[in-house]
Amino acid sequence: LLAKIPREYLQGICKIGIPTAIQGMAYCAISMVLTRMISGYGAEAVATQRVGGQIESISWNTADGFAAALNAFIAQNYGAGKNDRGKKGYKASLWTVGIWGLLISAVFICIPEPIARIFFHEPKAIATSVEYLIIIGFSEAFMCVELTTVGALSGLGRTRLCSIISIAFTSARIPLSIILGGIMGLDGIWWAISSTSIVTVSYTHLRAHETRRHL
């Protein structure tokens, strides 16, 4: 533990780890700003955001698990020169997680009220939660695909690309929330979060496709 770390190892660790660390810090900062904006709509809105995030974990925790496994799988096969095997693993993971995301989207959009009633009893809180689940439901499948694609790119050592895309589009939630919030109220903030997730995965998947073509 006290031995000197070789410089080339340290550089490699920092090259892969620092972009991801910055992305995590940026996401936390943006979430705090959005929470401050949401708090202006009352306690029900804040509660909906917090509980909604826990409900969403059904989809993103699953996708995150696949992303972690895919990261190791892609890195192993890329290092061994078995790029075709890595591509097959990515496609299989993408289909699995995509179908799961679509299922969660369908549940959120089609039966939001029974889900909301599990966590809330006040009519206003239930109504706010129902709107949240419907709007966020449109982005669940996209979010699952995004996390899986990020896992694949990270396995190739392209963490900087993933972080730049994620920070750029996640940051766009703030001005978009201000604009849509002024027009649609609280629902505008939900739409800002949902729409940026959809755009993020579209762009990330495009860059991943370009990366795979050059392997």
Q: What are these language model-derived features?
A:
Residues L1-I18, I74-S139, L180-A208, R212-R213:
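Short alpha-helical transmembrane segments in multi-pass integral membrane proteins
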Residues I16, G24, V51, I55-S57, ...:
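Hydrophobic alpha-helical segments, especially transmembrane helices
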Residues T35, Q49-P112, M143-I165:
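Small-residue-rich hydrophobic transmembrane alpha-helices
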Residues L2-V33, I58-T62, F66, L133, ...:
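Hydrophobic faces of transmembrane alpha-helices in multi-pass small-molecule transporters and flippases
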Residues L10-G12, C28, A45, I58-T62, ...:
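Hydrophobic alpha-helical transmembrane segments of integral membrane proteins
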Residues M25-Q54, I58, Q76-N77, P114-P123, ...:
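Helix-terminus/linker motif at the lipid-water interface of multi-pass membrane proteins
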Residues A63-A68, I136-G155, L161-L176, D187-Y203:
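Short runs within selected transmembrane alpha-helices of multi-pass transporters and secretion channels
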